[in-house]
């Protein structure tokens, strides 16, 4: 899986992963992080998720990172926003009010771009990556975050042999294997969602659940 895979999906409109509303699990569990309003929240592989607007409405500053210029443009256009723009080594920056999106490769981020992020919201990033890329993703995106950073991680679990990702199945054992060395991991919720995801059932998936984790940097 390379950058062209994701760029092509946006160009062709193959974006079934994009939700048309704010994720209810975010609204339900975000306050468990107990963040100050002024906290800056990193949203890796953000696409054009409406969750960023919700986070901004809570008083947070939001930093999204997205590879596709089309996704970034659509995010601001659909909100009727005209962002200011500038370039850096990390990519092209789009800024409107409390929301900033860096259009660039998350795997090429400079640590300085994340220096003032005190929280991370990962709904569609970790599950978008095959197993062989996840450790590198943590080293690139999570490791540079400040000590005692907070996070909300949302994953999917299903029999991986029944469906090719993305999104990929990331079960609790794998979450702990990835995060336990640097993060305290607490599962906040785990529930079956197969009835709410007919596209998975149509592809022959026999079981599907989602899990929500609170992360606390050590």
UniProtKB/Swiss-Prot annotation:
Identify the keywords attached in UniProt to this record, alphabetized. Answer: Cytoplasm, Methyltransferase, S-adenosyl-L-methionine, Transferase
Under PROSITE patterns, the record lists:
SAM_MT_TPMT
Q: Which InterPro entries match?
A: SAM-dependent_MTases_sf, Thiopur_S-MeTfrase_Se/Te_detox, Thiopurine_S-MeTrfase, TPMT
Binding site residues for S-adenosyl-L-methionine:
10, 45, 66, 123
List where the protein spans the membrane: none
Tell whether Zinc is among the UniProt keywords.
no
Concerning Pfam families, the annotation shows:
TPMT
- E.C. number: 2.1.1.67
**Can the keyword Secreted be found in this entry's annotation?**
no
Q: What GO MF annotations does this protein's record show?
A: thiopurine S-methyltransferase activity
> What GO biological process terms are annotated to this protein in UniProt?
methylation; response to metal ion
Reaction(s) this enzyme catalyzes, per UniProt: S-adenosyl-L-methionine + a thiopurine = S-adenosyl-L-homocysteine + a thiopurine S-methylether
From which domain of life does this come?
Answer: Bacteria
The EC category is: transferase
Location(s), subcellular: Cytoplasm
Q: Which GO CC terms are listed, alphabetically? A: cytoplasm
NCBIfam families registered for this protein in UniProt: PRK13255.1, TMPT_Se_Te
Family under the similarity heading: Belongs to the class I-like SAM-binding methyltransferase superfamily. TPMT family.
Protein's UniProt name = Thiopurine S-methyltransferase
Organism of provenance = Xanthomonas euvesicatoria pv. vesicatoria (strain 85-10)
By which gene is this protein encoded? tpm
């Amino acid at each position: 899986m390379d950058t062209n895979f994701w760029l092509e999906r946006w160009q062709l409109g193959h974006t079934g992963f994009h939700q048309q509303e704010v994720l209810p699990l975010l609204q339900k569990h975000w306050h468990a992080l107990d963040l100050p309003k002024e906290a800056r929240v990193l949203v890796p592989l953000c696409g054009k998720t409406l969750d960023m607007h919700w986070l901004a409405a809570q008083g947070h500053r939001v930093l999204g990172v997205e590879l596709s210029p089309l996704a970034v443009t659509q995010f601001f256009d659909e909100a009727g926003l005209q962002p200011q723009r500038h370039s850096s080594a990390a990519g092209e920056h789009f800024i409107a009010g409390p929301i900033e999106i860096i259009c660039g490769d998350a795997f090429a981020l400079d640590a300085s771009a994340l220096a003032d992020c005190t929280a991370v919201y990962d709904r569609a990033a970790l599950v978008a990556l095959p197993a062989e890329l996840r450790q590198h993703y943590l080293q690139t995106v999570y490791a540079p975050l400040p000590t005692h950073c907070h996070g909300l991680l949302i994953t999917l679990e299903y029999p991986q042999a029944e469906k090719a990702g993305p999104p990929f199945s990331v079960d609790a054992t794998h979450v702990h294997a990835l995060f336990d060395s640097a993060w305290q991991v607490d599962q906040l919720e785990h529930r079956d969602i197969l009835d709410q995801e007919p596209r998975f059932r149509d592809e022959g998936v026999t079981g599907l659940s989602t899990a929500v984790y609170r992360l606390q940097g050590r």
